[in-house]
Amino acid sequence: SDVYKRQVLKFGDFTLKSGRKSPFFMNAGAYVTGSQLKKLGEYYARAIHETYGDDFDVLFGPAYKGIPLGVVTAIAYSELYGKEVRYCSDRKEEKDHGADKGSFLGSKLKDGDRVIMIEDVTTSGKSMEETVPKVKGAADVTIVGLMVSLNRMEVGKGGEKCALDEIKDLYGFETAAIVSMADVVEHLYNKECQGKVVIDDTLKAAIDAYYEQY
């Protein structure tokens, strides 16, 4: 209900980056205040720790939304688990001047680094097509896995498996999410939040129809 109250998860009619029409939309960028971002970083840090453990060096958040995600998660990881991990993000436009010129923000990737990728959500896996070659091309690194906030649980571009499973099969690293859409529906169906039922029968039917299609 926290993500609903903060308008991070919205219900309605949305056209996604993939072109799909969806009855729900997840936007971790709606976390905008200090306390909200602190909590978001803790969500990611706990999920990463539970899924992947401590054997990694760098949190990589693809530009643009992944930049603050990498920063707040690195801070939270240090506070929660006492482990210093570096953060790195790519630049959309390469910087050609100054001490930090190049294609990346934050820490430089080094040979031997073990990297965990962070995104808010992935629908079709398209962003990984751009990000994975950049990360692999920067140094001899191992991508340990990907963590997203929400597993939308819809099929990826191949039309058979969900996007997270497609990414796992294509690139050979693990994928995970803080929550799945099934968790969200179970938690909010016929439940009141801020004086109204969040997912009523009509919205539940729209979500079910979406999953029949995708």
PLM features per residue range, with description:
Residues 52-56, 109-112:
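Short helix-loop-beta connector
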Residues 71-115, 129:
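Short, glycine/charge-rich flexible loops or terminal/linker lids adjacent to PRPP-binding catalytic cores
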Residues 54-65:
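Short glycine-rich phosphate-binding loop at a beta-alpha junction
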Residues 133, 137-214:
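PRPP-dependent phosphoribosyltransferase catalytic core
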Residues 104-151:
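A contiguous pocket-lining binding segment that forms or flanks enzyme active sites
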Residues 15-55:
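An N-terminal, well-structured beta->alpha segment
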Residues 17, 106-111, 168-169:
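Solvent-exposed alpha-helices and their adjacent loops that cap or buttress functional pockets
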Residues 3-4:
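Short, small-residue-biased leader/transition segments that mark boundaries at the very start
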